[in-house]
Amino acid sequence: MNTLLQTIADGDPLSRPEAEEAMATMMSGSARDEHIAALLMGLRTRGETLDELVGFTKTMREFAVSVETDDPQTIDLCGTGGDGASTFNISTTASFIAAGAGATVAKHGNRSVSSQSGSADVLEALGVQIDLEKEGVEHCLHEAGIAFLFAPFFHPAMRHVMPVRKALGVRTFFNILGPLCNPAGVTRQIVGAFDTSTAQTMVRILAELDADHVITLHADDGLDEVSISASTTLFEYDASDQNPVPRSHEVGPERHDLDRASISTLEGGTAQQNASILRNILSGEDQGPRRDVALLNAAYALHVSDQYADLDACLEAAAESIDSGAALDALNTLASVSKEAKSE
């Protein structure tokens, strides 16, 4: 580790193998806290290179508890958090809509970062058993077509760096890595970022690590979701393209014939309040902006699953998922199956 720290102190980049070595040293518990702090702050000050981030991500994935899925088109919707907007749980709601439309969803998440209610918090309030280990999650994926992968259970090696991260109290490259390290090994993702530059970096990392179809994004109103209150910058990588490279484009709700709405209409609250909002959307009771933003994010998730012809078809499928009751069924089934898995 001393040699790697000297390289950083000299202002030189780590090679990809050196980044892998540094991460393996941290994840195995072999690094001293002061060395971890020096590495994190040295790279934060200088700025990480793509090779460094790819090496870190690759190794963090190797240290995760692996979850098997039968469906190679399994998707995930997650984000870095930290957008400070305190919206309801948009990507979690969209996950159930996507599952109701036929996608297999391995939802990777944690407790709250910047709001009162993270994905784990709202799912717990909805009666989903979140503290499932590998076998329980695999059971949910097989029986319900959707599962929640509670990050602390699947990234146990992170305990070696958590005290330093908490003590530093600033964003580091670990804030970027988490959403890129789904334990189910998904190659199809929607990943929201806390700024546009980070979204662009994340798509390049995923492209280097054999993604099939991914979109990273950041909205002009600050959301790490596809927004209906502002335009959203998307960075898309599709390995099936004739010339597969990350491409960027901007979308507003008008592109999908949806009305713009103030970001205040998307405001959430406590886990219990967000659970009520989510259930009202899935039941079809809420026909307003919250439904629209959930549909939009579900549509882009279905888009990266490549199960529908185009985005318009994805949006129609998302609406049908709610209107047919399939999205609500996906929630109720996960709640039931997750409890079965916990009791086994």
UniProtKB/Swiss-Prot annotation:
<protein>
    <recommendedName>
        <fullName>Anthranilate phosphoribosyltransferase</fullName>
        <ecNumber>2.4.2.18</ecNumber>
    </recommendedName>
</protein>
<keyword id="KW-0057">Aromatic amino acid biosynthesis</keyword>
<feature type="binding site">
    <location>
        <begin position="82"/>
        <end position="83"/>
    </location>
    <ligand>
        <name>5-phospho-alpha-D-ribose 1-diphosphate</name>
    </ligand>
</feature>
<dbReference type="InterPro" id="IPR017459">
    <property type="entry name" value="Glycosyl_Trfase_fam3_N_dom"/>
</dbReference>
<dbReference type="InterPro" id="IPR005940">
    <property type="entry name" value="Anthranilate_Pribosyl_Tfrase"/>
</dbReference>
<dbReference type="InterPro" id="IPR036320">
    <property type="entry name" value="Glycosyl_Trfase_fam3_N_dom_sf"/>
</dbReference>
<keyword id="KW-0028">Amino-acid biosynthesis</keyword>
<feature type="binding site">
    <location>
        <begin position="89"/>
        <end position="92"/>
    </location>
    <ligand>
        <name>5-phospho-alpha-D-ribose 1-diphosphate</name>
    </ligand>
</feature>
<feature type="binding site">
    <location>
        <position position="79"/>
    </location>
    <ligand>
        <name>anthranilate 1</name>
    </ligand>
</feature>
<dbReference type="GO" id="GO:0000162">
    <property type="term" value="P:L-tryptophan biosynthetic process"/>
</dbReference>
<comment type="pathway">
    <text>Amino-acid biosynthesis; L-tryptophan biosynthesis; L-tryptophan from chorismate: step 2/5.</text>
</comment>
<keyword id="KW-0808">Transferase</keyword>
<keyword id="KW-0822">Tryptophan biosynthesis</keyword>
<feature type="binding site">
    <location>
        <begin position="107"/>
        <end position="115"/>
    </location>
    <ligand>
        <name>5-phospho-alpha-D-ribose 1-diphosphate</name>
    </ligand>
</feature>
<feature type="binding site">
    <location>
        <position position="119"/>
    </location>
    <ligand>
        <name>5-phospho-alpha-D-ribose 1-diphosphate</name>
    </ligand>
</feature>
<feature type="binding site">
    <location>
        <position position="224"/>
    </location>
    <ligand>
        <name>Mg(2+) 2</name>
    </ligand>
</feature>
<dbReference type="GO" id="GO:0000287">
    <property type="term" value="F:magnesium ion binding"/>
</dbReference>
<feature type="binding site">
    <location>
        <position position="225"/>
    </location>
    <ligand>
        <name>Mg(2+) 1</name>
    </ligand>
</feature>
<keyword id="KW-0460">Magnesium</keyword>
<dbReference type="GO" id="GO:0005829">
    <property type="term" value="C:cytosol"/>
</dbReference>
<comment type="function">
    <text>Catalyzes the transfer of the phosphoribosyl group of 5-phosphorylribose-1-pyrophosphate (PRPP) to anthranilate to yield N-(5'-phosphoribosyl)-anthranilate (PRA).</text>
</comment>
<feature type="binding site">
    <location>
        <position position="110"/>
    </location>
    <ligand>
        <name>anthranilate 1</name>
    </ligand>
</feature>
<feature type="binding site">
    <location>
        <position position="91"/>
    </location>
    <ligand>
        <name>Mg(2+) 1</name>
    </ligand>
</feature>
<dbReference type="InterPro" id="IPR035902">
    <property type="entry name" value="Nuc_phospho_transferase"/>
</dbReference>
<comment type="similarity">
    <text>Belongs to the anthranilate phosphoribosyltransferase family.</text>
</comment>
<dbReference type="InterPro" id="IPR000312">
    <property type="entry name" value="Glycosyl_Trfase_fam3"/>
</dbReference>
<feature type="binding site">
    <location>
        <position position="225"/>
    </location>
    <ligand>
        <name>Mg(2+) 2</name>
    </ligand>
</feature>
<keyword id="KW-0328">Glycosyltransferase</keyword>
<feature type="binding site">
    <location>
        <position position="87"/>
    </location>
    <ligand>
        <name>5-phospho-alpha-D-ribose 1-diphosphate</name>
    </ligand>
</feature>
<dbReference type="Pfam" id="PF02885">
    <property type="entry name" value="Glycos_trans_3N"/>
</dbReference>
<feature type="binding site">
    <location>
        <position position="165"/>
    </location>
    <ligand>
        <name>anthranilate 2</name>
    </ligand>
</feature>
<feature type="binding site">
    <location>
        <position position="79"/>
    </location>
    <ligand>
        <name>5-phospho-alpha-D-ribose 1-diphosphate</name>
    </ligand>
</feature>
<dbReference type="GO" id="GO:0004048">
    <property type="term" value="F:anthranilate phosphoribosyltransferase activity"/>
</dbReference>
<keyword id="KW-0479">Metal-binding</keyword>
<comment type="subunit">
    <text>Homodimer.</text>
</comment>
<dbReference type="Pfam" id="PF00591">
    <property type="entry name" value="Glycos_transf_3"/>
</dbReference>
